[in-house]
Amino acid sequence: MRKTSPKPDLDAYLRLNNASFEEWITALRVLSGCDDIKCRPHSGGGSIGSLSALDSARGRVISLKASKGIDVSGFRSTESVLLLPREGVPEIAIRGGLWRPLDRLLVLVPQDRFELRLAPGTKVMILRPEIGALGDWIAQSSDQCLSVLEAIVDCYLERLPFVRGDEQARQLTNRFFDTLATPWTPRKAAVCSERNLDRRLQRVVEKIMQDPAWEFDLKELASYAGVSERNLYYLMKRETGITPYRFYQRARLTRVRERLVDCQCEVPHISWYAADEGFSHLGRFAAMYREHFGELPSETVQWRRNLLRRSVASAEELVET
């Protein structure tokens, strides 16, 4: 059984959070390219969940997280699709078949129209390559090969929270899809086998992510991790590729993004949200935001506004009966 503890994954590319039914299904249609997707909530009212998405030239990675139980049907693709459970144990039904647990990586070919059943707190990653990005071999993968593929996907997702910015995130995503395009070899198992982050760095990550009020202090952070300041700096740089402060900065920017994504007011208070996270100069904040996420803060807000302006079908058409 897979470990299913909460994972940051695509938090930096959040598109919807605490979304209503209409917003969630419309966004999923837009991001997946499947206009006939339908969904059926297990109970009425309230937020459906969150959606994140990262695009690259070689493919798209989508994260679905349910805050309430929901069945989603109508998924299809012109290319093979990879599904990976990240939190909880979702269920899947393929070609109208019986529901079964989705408890490991699954590769689906274009004719595999499928449905997902998400319980509250369930999170699923959908990895959709561009046309021609994957080789034909991937749909015929053996159990051994699937285990290696899962390790490759896990390694990619574990590295994403530690990229320096948007450009590196997209480069990493391109390399990930390129890796999947070549036939499996034993070397991939050795190079991409999953490994845990050093426990001292795990403490650092938890401190930064779980204590929004904390102001950066390398000495305090090193003491918390149980290492010297110098060792912490070089340990994190070696293990993740970024410095402790860079990770702290990205975490603060991600928290601002979460508030912008949730914003439904007529005039978004971008400067207020930025100031709450310690960014006092709006111009520099906007530049850093774009460097990390590939868009300006105003564009994050505008994406949701554009979504709301779309011609969304009535609730009767969206909900399966």
Please tell me what each predicted stretch does:
Residues M1-H42, V81-L82, E91-P212, L218-K219, ...:
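Alpha-helical bundle regulatory/interaction domains
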Residues D36-G74:
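Long amphipathic N-terminal alpha/beta scaffold segment
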Residues A57-G59, A66-R95:
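Glycine- and acidic-residue-biased ligand/ion/polar-headgroup-sensing regions
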Residues L197-L201, Y248-L253:
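Generic hydrophobic, amphipathic alpha-helix propensity
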Residues A225, A251-L253, R257, D276-E277, ...:
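C-terminal helix-loop subdomains that flank or include functional centers
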Residues L232, M236, R284-F285, Y289:
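Short hydrophobic/aromatic patch on the recognition helix
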Residues R238-E239, E291-H292, W303:
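Alpha-helical DNA-recognition elements
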